[in-house]
Amino acid sequence: MRSDSLIKAVIIAAGLVLGLVLSATPSALAGQFSIGTWKTAQTIAPFYYADFVSGEDSVTVYPFTNPADQKNALLAGSLDMCGTTVAHAIHSASMGQPVVMVAALCNKSSALVVRKDAGIEAVSDLKGKRIGYVPGTMHEILLRETLSRSGLSAQTDVSLLRIDFFDMGLALSRGNIDAFLSGEPFPALAVEKGYGEILAYPYYKEAVGDINAGMLVTRDFVKKHPEKVQQLVTAHARASRHLARHPDQWLTRASAFGTQKSVLEKAAANMELAWDMDAAFVSRVRALGQRMQALGMIRRQPDYNALIDLSFVQQARKELTADE
């Protein structure tokens, strides 16, 4: 009888252990990191984390096509860290979602493109024209800011047409639109193919500047595993620095995502791999949040002190300095 009871106890204990393992989030598994990002040249850094973590650690990168899906996977516990646009991070935080931005991912990477030989030489020439855009994105904000600075109303002076980023080039080449504002490599591709030309790079230092995307973790991950967050942020910083110092390697690897290297070389000057954040970065994030609320994209401002944690990049800065 005692033997039967002992066997039963062992089986129950084993079942409990198995249940804990199966229900564990990635962060609970020591040395195993799950990261989400896009397959673009400007968001490539996570694919290099494995080169900059300790030998016992492993990194699995999951590609996504949009920031919302990455963030949802993060909140569900399927990812330890993910990329997102700064605009989406603000939107998520304004809704009370427990996300924390712990590093930048990329800056710049956007451009306003017009049809080649269409006689559009200044933003003011877009009056009465059709412009492709994706609502609710960073690019919509940049487009509206660019139009406003040239005295144009997005409501009355131009026609904004909702077009997916992947379809903008075709629409421009066919004459269905006169311009579009999107992220790289689509502007460079329009130039490479000969149907478009760059009208403007929509970066305004006294306002939003050139911020674009960052890396998110959950508040719970920061609280329970700060040392793992630091590992990832430092790996991100080292990967970003390595790629910036080796542009040929960066663009060659990025071309495997489906864009010709010649196009990426045209786009390279407009793409900035990033990791560091400082007070100026936070000020630009706040400015972006104000623009989003003015446009009705968010109802209230998030708590920026809770959204952005500078401590991890500050430590990474020290570690990278020590590397030199």
Model features per residue range: what roles?
Residues 2-14:
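Bacterial N-terminal signal peptides that target proteins for export
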Residues 54, 203-207, 274-281:
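Short, solvent-exposed loop/beta-turn-alpha elements that line the ligand-binding surface or hinge
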